[in-house]
Amino acid sequence: MYDKTWEACGLALLRAQNLRLSFSDRLLFENISFDVENRDKIGFIGANGVGKTTIFKILSGQLQPAQGDVFVAKDIQIGYMEQHAGVEKDRTVYSELLSVFSHFEKMEQELELLAAQIEKNGKDIDTLVARQLSLQEQYENNGGLTYKSRTRAALLGLGFTEADMHRPALTLSGGQLSKLNLAKLLLSGANLLLLDEPTNHLDIASVEWLESFIKDFKGAAVIISHDRYFLDAVTNKTMELSHGHLTAYSGNYTQFIKKKEKINEDLKRRYENEIKEIKRIEGIVEQQRRWGQSHNFITAASKQKQADRLKKALVKPEDDAQAIHFSLTPRRESGNDVLQCRDLSISFDGKPLFEGVNLHLTKGQRVFLLGANGCGKTTLFKILMGKHHAQGEIRFGANVDVGYFDQVQADLNLEKSALDEVWDAFPNMSQTQVRTALGTFLFKGDDVFKPVKL
């Protein structure tokens, strides 16, 4: 059940109780309960596929759990990225973001109308003036004098240039659209933000701006992120979803790691001691049975019950989290000279993006390409892949085969399963080989049959 009529209990803005959900007879999670309190900044962590985004959908009312309740306090507005996806056809980047303040624009229009009516000295002037003063006060108290400057500040903070602000929003790349949707969410007026990987597509300066925004944000935020440094900078609580259950900790990510290590060490020590005790008791049971007297069998039965109770109460320490393990092995050996670029230049709409780029890569080198958003890093990759034409010379060495990982992954068929998507790319592989390859990237069991979009 999703209920927005709940009276807040203490400082809680949202309460989740006993959430449970399954997909295709597979239990995703159960007994999930937690509170989000005023000014909480919560890091929500867990391995991919455990259900973090699914819980966000439940909290925002987009998905109903099989069991459990979500209570939201009165006057709490939840902001979730998917609610702000998509842009209007004819809007610029600036006007698209400004649209979240449409209520201020309506106030401005009414204030102009009231001013015109008052100027005519019509009847009911006292009523008109009273309405004007009330509306003006409401406009100013709610931020009407600063919303345009806040719009510009958010765009600049997230890496948009002055020129970008005047571009049609529909011409933005996938990464830029994600940033624009993030800006819309941040400025939406929501007082409880659900942020799912908010640092994706952000450069260092933009991440720093986002950190500052969240620290100053007077509402609460729950943040899914794999960026531990970002979580350390902005969070004061941590929730971990693991093996279908949720555990809450006070403190940021680093503090969570230390606490969890201590808990696991204590649990491992207790587990080992209990295993020793069970073996000791079972040794007594075996000995009593060998002695074979009636009173020995009574003692053996009593001790066996004691051992069974200990076994039932055993809590096994959590295994170390699985990590992705793979090696990059070229299908053939290249020459020593892998890539040479000379005087690469490219312009868009008559404006140079970059020029005079020279590059020489040799076999065995690992190169990190660093630069602000919009400076042309992805464009350079697309030039190398032949997707953009540029001035200058590009020469690949002997036996060089290029692999390209696109940040948007536009070539993926979201309706296919992970298994079929990889198998279609490598039809000569057996299903076992494909599933083994997927397993190295932690696609286990039925996960390989899920549509890519999930």
Predicted features and spans:
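Intracellular alpha-helical coupling/juxtamembrane segments of multi-pass membrane proteins
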Residues: K260-I284, N296, A300-L314
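Short, flexible active-site-proximal loops enriched in glycine and acidic residues
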Residues: A163, K276, V315-D319
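Intrinsically disordered, low-complexity regions
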Residues: A307, L314-A321, H325
